Amino acid sequence: EPDIRAKLDMMQASRVPLERCSGYSYRFNAPPCDMSKAWLTEEEYNEALRRWSSNVDVSRQALQEGNIALSLRTGLVDPNVPQRQTNLIVDPPNGLLPALTPEGKRLALQMGSDWALPGEDLTFDGPEDFDNWDRCITRGLPSSMMPYRYNGGFFIEQAPGYVIFRLEMIHEARIIPTTDVEELPPEIKQYLGHSRGRWEGTTLVVETTNFKATNPLLNLAVVGAPPGNRFPSSEQLKVTERVVRLNDDTWLYEITAEDPVILTAPFTVRYPMRHNPDYLMPEYACHEGNTIVRYYTETSRYERANPTPEPEQAPVAVSADVAKALNGRWVGRPRIVTVDLDIELEFTDNGDNTVNAKLIGTTLGEINKPLRDLTIDGRVVRFTLPNIDPWRFQGELTADGTLQGIVASAQGSLPVTFRPLKRK
């Protein structure tokens, strides 16, 4: 059998967003991203390398000065080297995730997670309100095999007739037979499914079925993944992986996910990894003592039993024409492939060149809380949605009567256009 043993590091591709022009590519008033661009030019790639090297130098100097926090910023501990590809998805060719089926979107809205969607008011009453990654059970597939920003060790080991994929995150191991062995009956389901391998020349091909329908297909450890960790899977999920050793230093990895219950089409991710013979795989403790689920639940119950009054929103001074244009209800839908999430706002013209505003609610339920940190500078509007995971909006009241901008949080940033819904 071909020798593909290696100590690989997924973090080397962790700067590459999942979708083309996604994640941190969105900025308010930034130049539009080129959706046709799958690869950086030589000049662009060299400039990305220059900026990355400069950040590494800053991190190295910080480490020498004893500033541990600053030294961990980039490149020194996690070698997230710029890549030439602009996105991880190579199929569909547009570099975007396929749309979810109606059933997929219905299931997405039922999923639990400790990551809030824009405007969502999360509550926790038990383990079922969290996903499997929150609970340190598994990231599932294909999530486990996506490049992410920390604990990215991926060791490939071999024995006669077997290949072992050993992962640093969640310290999982997949033992993959490459010869004919007895198949699992279809009624037996596993978190990471049932894998079978075969060789096509020097390429290892692994097909995996028999999944438990409890894992998100993707999660937020991947730059540019859909927010909220609401990406369901079904028992009909099938994952196909291809691994080939290109030379002594570089391995090419590809993974395809198809799930007719959830996805309207399959999608494929491909990226290179470098072999690092000195890579040490430390213990992955997840959250120490597995206490986070209990703490979240206890805190959520306490906060609901003892609600903190919302601070009063001071009226915000604006011009008369802006007050008139904003007055009324607005609805916007950020681009989130997994859910159709409508966000409804209400601005009130106080009649004295000031306005107030609140979040009426979202598709997930009514909120009726004042917008936080509301500022209006000319026609530029900024505010924070009042929920557990702060989402900050920055946009502009346009000449065509819409409110266009970006809503962003630690999960990434999303373009959104709010349109008038009901005039007062």
Where are these regions (language model features)?
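PEST-like low-complexity, intrinsically disordered acidic/proline/serine-rich tracts
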Residues: E1-E344, N356-K358, T362-N368, V380, ...
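Residue-level recognition of beta-strand termini and adjacent short loop/turns
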Residues: N247, G351, A399-G401
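Beta-strand repeat architectures
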Residues: N350-N356
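A short, surface-exposed loop/turn module that caps and links secondary-structure elements
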Residues: K369-T375
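Extended lipid/amphipathic-ligand handling interfaces
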Residues: L374, G395-L397
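Ser/Thr- and Asn-enriched, surface-exposed coil loops between beta-strands
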Residues: T375-V380, G401
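Residues on the solvent-exposed faces and adjacent turns
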Residues: L385
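Alpha-helical, heptad-rich or low-complexity scaffold/stalk segments
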Residues: R392-F393, T402-Q404
